[in-house]
Each structure stands twice: as structure tokens, then as C-alpha cells.
Amino acid sequence: MTTQWPRLNLAAGPVEVMPRTLRDQGRPILYHYDPAFIELFARTSGLLQQVFRTEYDAVIMQGEAILGLEAAAASLISPGDKVLNLVSGVFGKWFEDFIEKYGGETIELAVPYDDAVDPEDVRRALHANPGVKFLSVVHSETPSGTHNPVRDICRVAHEFGVLTMIDTVSGLGGELYSPEEWGMDVAVAGPQKCLGGTPGLTLMSVSPAAWAAMEARRPGPLRGSFLSILDWKSAWLEGRRFPYTPSVSEVYSLESVLEQTLAIGMERFVDRHQLIAAAARAGVRALGLDLWPARDEIAAACVTAVTVPDGLDEALLRKTMRHRYGVMISPGYGSLQGKLFRLAHMGPAQAHPTTLAAQLAVLERSLVDVGHPVALGAGVGAAMAALGNWNDEA
């Protein structure tokens, strides 16, 4: 028997995409050295710079964003380099595997997975560990629904001459970035989260200092590898060539979502995510449920993480939402499995009042179905009341 597809994909990514994106992705395949594709790739790179709000080089690597995270480590870290790795969640901890794989020495600064890293603790760690060359941090920890104060963290790092590697996979589109002002040397994002695109590409912003560090890597620059960011610099940025065949249809999709994002306007696009996230938190609280993040100021814009209350079978809850009502949400991930579940609201299709209302309505009904009574309509009502000045056409 074939499993029926969900009516609503409200999981933590890949997310639902807009009809225009699917249409644009389905355009005829071009030869990657056709002048039309070269023009399209250049235009898409320029759009990506606008979304990052940077004059730094934009790099579009051909692989899901985990490729870009490993590429950052592989291209920058020399054996013996000290890397201050900030850990506030599953993905922050995971990055240590890359640091050590490429010979780096990890210095870990960790906080509980419902909290965020304090920039002053970063300052103290850098004082206590002279010679740190790089700092790595996750901006938006999707598994725990939290975010770190990346702007202040990066500024502290630059005070010490430390280059920064930022995981913005689920952050881009949920917050306004300014890599030059903030001190983001390598920022790695994905199109399948807040931008509402399809998975398959890595989106990067790379500073001049990061390029120089890649060239200075010991025993030599990483070249001739799928992980080489420098290969993209010399091939595409300097020569309008590709180090390997790009994923043509994925580039079509990326161009489409970047155009749609900029048509809305970056400030408005981010404001929508922030507003929907606040409404989701209000809805969850109205159902008598606790949020996983320790405080609202560190709650992510992309997902709302909900603590599993005592006595609730969260796997049964998710199964009920998915198979009885057709709504897919995400469980906890890694060490957080069974401790929380996540309501996603990222990208234009998810971060919308209509979608949020449906998600909360199904959550309410499913909680009742699995024996955890709540007042039907309470969550939806609180969320809609919290939306304030939402206007699709404004």
C-alpha cells in the first residue's frame, strides 16, 4: 500500500514551496555553458548577494548545505589550528566532527540546548585561549528552535582577529544579515528553509579575509575537490567557468525564490517570519504547553519548539496529525528526540496566518484525540490575536 502524501508539509525543512517555484524549476534544461545559463547563474549570484545584504562574494555550491559546512572546515582549517566552537544545540556539536576531521583543535564553549551563547562568555573564552584562529557558531539551531546572537558574537571574534564560520542554514530569510557590519567571514545557508526553496544547493557569503585564509591553508590550499570553495572562486568568480556541472534545475529554483523574496522586500520578508513565530508561541502557550527555549528572546524565527508534557506520547501525537489529518510536523532531533516537537513556519508557504491556523487547529484536535485535553480553538484564537497588523497586500 502506498503511503498517502500529507496535505500540509509543516516540518522543519525541506519546506513546502510556492507554485511559481515549482513551475520555474521545471523549465527546459540548458547546457551549463549556454550563454543563457551563464547569464542566469550570474544573475542568481547577484540576487543572493542582495538577500545576504552584502558586497562579499556569493558562492553557490552544488549540494545541500551540509556540503557547504564541511567545505568551510575543509577549505579553512589547517592541522593544529585552534577553533572555538560554540555549542547550543545538535548542529553546533556536530560541527566539531568537521573541525577534527581536518586536523583542527576544538575548544568548546557549550550551553544547555534550550539556551543561547552569551557574547561575553565568548570574550572570556578567547582571552583564556590565545591563538584561536577560527570561531564556528550556528545562528539558528533548528532542532531546538533557538538562535544565537551572531552579530555580537562575530564582533567579539573580530576584536581578537578571529575569523568566523557561521551556520545560517535556517537563519537566512528569518533575520536581516549584514556580513560586513557583523563580521561574518563565511556564512553558509540553504534555500530549503526560510527562503522556501528546494533542497540541493549551498548558499555562501565569503569575505576577503576568508579567501586569504583559504589560500594560506597548510600544507596548501584545498584544490581539485568537491569541497573546495577556492575552486569556485577561480572557476566561476574569476573565469565564468564551473568546477563541475551545476544542478541546472536547482539553480532555476533558487533564482525563482530569490526573486520572490526580494519582490516582497527583505525587511518585510523577515518581519513576516518574526510575526508568525511570535503568533505561534502565543498559540502554543494558550494550549497550556511550554516552549522549549528558555526565553522568547532566543526563540528562532523558523520553528517553534514545544516541550513534551508529562504523560504525552509525542510520537502518537505526530502520527495522529500526519495520518488522521494530513499535517506533517517534526520531532526532536538527535539528543532532543522525545523531549520536544517542532512546529515549522518558514518560507512563504509556511510562514502565513492561514497555514499557522491550520497547523494549530490540527495540533489542538490531535492533542484531544491522544488523551491530552485542551480547549479547542484556544491556540488558534491566541495566535490570530497576536498577528496584529498582518496584511498580504501591504
What residue spans do the PLM features occupy?
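Active-site C-terminal subdomain of aminotransferase-like
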Residues: 16-17, 192-286, 390-394
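Conserved PLP-binding catalytic core of the aspartate aminotransferase-like
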Residues: 291-324
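PLP-dependent enzyme catalytic core of the Aspartate aminotransferase-like
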Residues: 335, 339-394
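Conserved beta-loop-alpha segment that forms the PLP phosphate-binding cup at the N-terminus of a helix
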Residues: 55-84, 88, 92-97
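Conserved active-site segment immediately N-terminal to the catalytic lysine
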Residues: 180-192
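A glycine-/small-polar-enriched, mobile loop at the entrance of the PLP active site in fold-type I
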Residues: 6-62, 66
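Active-site phosphate-binding strand-loop segment of PLP-dependent enzymes
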Residues: 117-171, 186
